[in-house]
From Swiss-Prot:
Keyword Secreted: yes
UniProt source species: Ranoidea chloris (Red-eyed tree frog)
Function, in words: Antimicrobial peptide. Adopts an alpha helical conformation which can disrupt bacterial membranes. Strongly inhibits the formation of NO by neuronal nitric oxide synthase (nNOS) at micromolar concentrations. Acts by a non-competitive mechanism, probably by binding to calcium/calmodulin and as a consequence blocking calmodulin attachment to nNOS.
Matching Pfam families: Caerin_1 (PF07440)
Segments forming a coiled coil: none
Protein name per the record: Caerin-1.9
UniProt comment concerning the protein's domains: Contains two amphipathic alpha helix regions separated by a region of less-defined helicity and greater flexibility.
């Protein structure tokens, strides 16, 4: 369902987003 798609996207996006957020903090 929709949550499955969002979860799949999150798994691909989070590894790229987390380092950027960590640098800003």
């Amino acid at each position: 369902g929709l949550f499955g798609v969002l979860g799949s996207i999150a798994k691909h996006v989070l590894p790229h987003v987390v380092p950027v957020i960590a640098e800003k903090l």
